[in-house]
UniProtKB/Swiss-Prot annotation:
Its main location: plastid. Residues 1-35 form a transit peptide. Keywords: 4Fe-4S, Chloroplast, Disulfide bond, Iron, Iron-sulfur, Metal-binding, Oxidoreductase, Plastid, Redox-active center, Transit peptide. The active site is at C89 (nucleophile). Binds 1 [4Fe-4S] cluster. Its EC number is 1.8.7.2. This is Ferredoxin-thioredoxin reductase catalytic chain, chloroplastic. Disulfide bonds join C89-C119. Its cofactor is [4Fe-4S] cluster. The record marks H118 as: Increases the nucleophilicity of the active site Cys.
Amino acid sequence: MKALQASTSYSFFSKSSSATLQRRTHRPQCVILSKVEPSDKSVEIMRKFSEQYARKSGTYFCVDKGVTSVVIKGLAEHKDSLGAPLCPCRYYDDKAAEATQGFWNCPCVPMRERKECHCMLFLTPENDFAGKDQTIGLDEIREVTANM
């Protein structure tokens, strides 16, 4: 007689003197990503934070406000989804772990230590792409990022 191979495995565990049958199926792990707009509150929080940090650090927003808008919106998305303003301009194998660690949370360690912002959100005055502004309006962010 031939043995049949099951596609589903079963494990038995003993719980308080009774046997429990637990069914385990082997499914590939996958991640489903969905595009969720950040809340207006988070965008406003990140906008105000960015303005305040630019003033405090003596840095300026990019001459192309589209760059500034996209980065602020990305920070707001991460604030909503991860609970922290993780740098939106980097690739992460595990965003949640990176957000917990804090190294790449805005302002990131390279920005705090050396005034090096990979996102071009905070630029030193001598940077060729630095504008003259340390402010940006919420309406400007909405307008630039409306179709993204």
